[in-house]
Regions:
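N-terminal Rossmann NAD(P)H-binding glycine-rich loop of SDR-like oxidoreductase domains
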Residues: 2-22
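SDR active-site strand-loop-helix element
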Residues: 7, 30, 55-59, 99-105, ...
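Adenosine-cofactor binding site in Rossmann-like domains, unifying the SAM/SAH pocket
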Residues: 27-46
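NAD(P)H-binding glycine-rich loop region in Rossmannoid oxidoreductase-like domains
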Residues: 40-82
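Catalytic helix-loop patch of NAD(P)-dependent Rossmann-fold dehydrogenases
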Residues: 72-79, 83, 107-149, 156
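NAD(P)-dependent short-chain dehydrogenase/reductase
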Residues: 129, 140-193
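Mid/C-terminal beta-alpha module of Rossmann-like enzyme folds, strongest
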Residues: 197-245, 249
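Amphipathic terminal alpha-helices
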Residues: 268-284
Length: 284
């Protein structure tokens, strides 16, 4: 049984705590209020005092209600997505703690291909992208330890305001793009798989984790409607008519690396995951 520290008590962090098997490993989650993980000395002491073996970093800046907030809070976005995760990574490296960092695949845009881990980001630091995307690319460029798991548009079978399904349900104006998405319970199972099998994280390095066979927004809302989760105010509009502080990433990620490295790990298609989530979601 390994001692696993989950840093960040937001949507993904709390979801991991809800889905992992507590009988397999000793999981503990901390928020920044409980442990100021921006303070290297405090984090260093905490890790030693609790014999931590793994850190899963789910902390970061995503923006509320969306990434546009990063344009007015650039320093905070940079600190939370670059500076603090690098500090955590450096401490893990010093103490030989296994480090899993949950990041984003929103550093690509366009449909000329399914983007792999080997592709140079085209929506990152050196492109006309958002501060959020630039910060995610910057961390990948600077980090040299542990593994980075890229997710996109996470969703679950709950009515959490951070879930992709909840966001779509509450929007009145929609734009139709095909995007990769991550079913959070599958992500949780993958993290547990890495820990259970004591996988060498340096081999994993950077990996895309999204459910295959991405659907576009219209396909998703059609599916939502079939399960009774429809919004009568939904209207599809031209993206050019929407006011956004920063451009958005729209893309499909490849999971060839995932299926090649871990052929025994089963991941369901996006539609299968959406079917399950929509069949079980309860709208408040």
């Amino acid at each position: 049984m390994s001692k696993v520290l989950i840093i960040g008590s937001g949507y993904v962090g709390q979801s991991i705590m809800s889905w992992v098997n507590p009988d397999k490993h000793n999981y503990r989650i901390v928020s920044r209020r409980q442990l100021d993980y921006s303070n290297q000395a405090l984090l260093h002491k905490f890790i030693l005092n609790h014999d931590i073996e793994y850190i899963v970093n789910c902390s970061g800046f995503t923006g509320r209600p969306n990434v546009d907030e990063g344009e007015t809070r650039k320093k905070e976005c940079w600190d939370l997505n670059v500076v603090i995760p690098l500090n955590i990574s450096n401490i893990c490296k010093q103490l030989s703690i296994k480090y899993i960092h949950i990041s984003s695949g929103c550093i690509y845009s366009g449909y000329e291909k399914e983007w792999s881990e080997q592709d140079e980001p085209n929506f990152g630091l050196f492109d006309a992208s958002s501060t959020y995307s630039k910060s995610k690319h910057a961390f990948e460029t600077l980090n040299d330890y542990g593994c980075i798991i890229r997710v996109r548009m996470p969703f679950c079978d709950d009515y959490n305001p951070r879930s992709y399904l909840t966001k779509i349900y509450k929007y009145d104006q929609l734009i139709n793009f095909k995007n990769s998405k991550t079913y959070v319970p599958d992500l949780c199972m993958f993290i547990e798989y890495l820990i259970d099998n004591k996988v060498d994280l340096s081999i994993v390095n950077t990996i895309n984790f999204v459910n295959p066979d991405a659907l576009d927004t219209m396909q998703v809302t059609d599916l939502m409607t079939s399960y009774g989760m429809d919004n009568p105010k939904w209207v599809y509009v031209d993206p050019k008519l929407l006011k956004m502080a920063a451009p958005r990433s729209n893309c499909v990620l490849s999971i060839d690396k995932l299926t090649s490295l871990f052929p025994d790990f089963d991941i369901q298609t996006e539609k299968q995951a959406l079917d399950y989530a929509l069949a079980n979601i309860k709208i408040d």
